[in-house]
UniProtKB/Swiss-Prot annotation:
It comes from Trichodesmium erythraeum (strain IMS101). Fe cation binds at residues 111, 115, 312. Substrate binds at residues 134-138, 167, 180, 184, 284. Its cofactor is Fe(2+). It comes from the Bacteria. This is tRNA N6-adenosine threonylcarbamoyltransferase. NCBIfam families: gcp_kae1, T6A_TsaD_YgjD. Required for the formation of a threonylcarbamoyl group on adenosine at position 37 (t(6)A37) in tRNAs that read codons beginning with adenine. Is involved in the transfer of the threonylcarbamoyl moiety of threonylcarbamoyl-AMP (TC-AMP) to the N6 group of A37, together with TsaE and TsaB. TsaD likely plays a direct catalytic role in this reaction. It is found in: Cytoplasm.
Length: 325
């Protein structure tokens, strides 16, 4: 199998891609950010209806941009879990229907497996075994990739995901949704050492801390209390103010350092020389800087997906369909 049609509708992006080997011939992404930003987050029912309205035109556009037709397609893949149930149903129904009509083999693809494979699209030297730091709006995990389709979760968040923490802190700072890009932008102009914020740690029953697990709820609460203190002192938090930029920078620095420290420790403990990053937070500039510096001192390698493959997209689902199945 060399050429696949892939569909991704797990949350608020309707994406259809055609992938040949590791070459992305088309990758259509219809974002719903402008719709959901009004509500401060994704509304599941609204997301499902939007997917339903544009899925057919996204499929047609993918074929046009790839300059292919159905006889050129060898198989179909679609995200099957995890995600919003109604949103997933739209993509799965479309994919399965097309598979029946055009007599193409169909495979359901796990969304997180897609993020793991996203790095393959732009980093052909990536081969198992390696450690994947998967950081998104719904998940934060350290995954030992032993082989294609063979995984072991070594660490994960015990509460909020990293991307979710970015969204919640952005809401506290009145920056809107989604929080990741705007915090990253403001942090570049702020002082990352302005505020001391706690790095989340998971205590073990016998004492000490879990070396690979994450926690962001305490950090989020610390930012909330900091914002309340500033407002009680009569200061208004504005998106362009220096204090808002400093909070954004301090928060982002704390998250990036925590993610980096655990990823490096995990890779060293398991004798894994390569760390691959996946998920929307993989686009964060501070995380990329911290990891790039850290691997140099430990003789490790870190590989990032292209920025266009960090957020949800069907190309990564197509890559799983080709490489992993």
């Amino acid at each position: 199998m060399t050429t696949v049609l892939a569909i991704e509708t797990s949350c608020d992006e309707t994406s259809v891609a055609i992938v040949k080997n590791r070459q992305v011939l088309s990758n259509i992404v219809k974002s719903q950010i402008n719709i959901h930003s009004f509500y401060g987050g994704v509304v599941p029912e609204v997301a499902s209806r939007q997917h339903l309205e544009i899925i057919n035109q996204a499929i047609a556009q993918a074929f046009r941009e790839a300059n292919l037709d159905w006889p050129d397609i060898d198989g179909i893949g679609a995200t099957c879990a995890p995600g919003l149930v109604g949103a997933l149903l739209v993509g799965l129904t479309a994919a399965k229907t097309l598979a029946i009509v055009h007599e193409k083999p169909f495979v359901g693809v796990h969304h997180l497996e897609g993020h793991i494979y996203a790095t393959y699209l732009s980093q052909p030297e990536l081969v198992p075994p390696f450690l994947c730091l998967l950081v998104s709006g719904g998940h934060t995990s350290l995954i030992y990739v032993k082989n294609c389709g063979e995984y072991e979760t070594l660490g994960q968040t015990r509460d909020d995901a990293a991307g979710e923490a970015f969204d919640k802190v952005a809401r506290l700072l009145k920056l809107g949704y989604p929080g990741g890009p705007v915090i990253d932008k403001l942090a570049a102009e702020g002082n990352k050492l302005a505020f001391s914020l706690p790095e989340g740690k998971i205590s073990l029953p016998g004492g000490g801390y879990h070396p690979y697990d994450f926690s962001f709820s305490g950090l989020k609460t610390a930012v909330l209390r900091l914002v309340q203190k500033i407002e009680q002192e009569g200061n208004e938090l504005l998106s362009g103010s220096s204090v808002t930029k400093d909070i954004a920078a301090s928060f982002q620095e704390t998250v990036a350092k925590g993610l980096t420290k655990r990823a490096i420790a995990c890779a060293l403990d398991y004798s894994l020389n390569t760390i691959a990053i996946g998920g929307g937070v993989a686009a964060n500039s501070s995380l990329r800087q911290h990891l790039s510096r850290a691997v140099e001192s430990h003789n490790l390698q870190v590989l990032f997906p292209s920025l266009r493959f960090c957020t949800d997209n069907a190309a990564m689902i197509g890559c799983v369909r080709l490489v992993g199945h």
